[in-house]
Amino acid sequence: MNKVLSLVFVQFLFFGLTVSAQTISPIIVECGKKCRGEFSIINNGLTPLAVTVEARSFSLDTLGHAINRSLDPGVDLRLEEGSARISPRGTHTFAYQLKCSAPPCSIALLSSMVVGHTAEGILVRIQLAHTVYACEKQKDCRKQVRAAAGVAVN
């Protein structure tokens, strides 16, 4: 019985150390046509992580799925950093300033990172999105954008 428990403990320890996920916080932000904000990437892994941030404008289809495109001409976005190296179990905060000349503006800040590779050697890259909705007024901005796209608003 002790041998079985020891084996279970070793498996738990092994899988507990190898299974990890990167996280982003906050996921969604609503603001006025001018805003400052920041988001954090947390590396829950045991190896350093290189992260790059790409800004994209997006619109929503009637099902609420995002359709990404390059930044709209009326969007002035300034990222303090476009990339970073995050230490194991570390956190990095990216700050930005956004001005939207023709609200509403919907922006996705896509953080890309390579988290491993397949048995065939293909790199596995993930993207985590920090979404910014900018309207004339901050209150219910996301609901306004979703309603304008024809998405059912709760």
Task: For each feature predicted by the language model, list its residue ranges.
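Terminal connector regions
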Residues: 99-144
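Asparagine-centered strand-capping/turn motif at beta-strand->loop junctions
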Residues: 41-47, 154
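Sec/Tat signal peptide C-region and signal peptidase I cleavage site
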Residues: 17-23
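Intrinsically disordered, low-complexity Pro/Gly/Ser/Thr-rich segments with frequent PxxP/GP/PP motifs
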Residues: 69-102
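Positively charged n-region of N-terminal signal peptides that target proteins for export
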Residues: 1-4
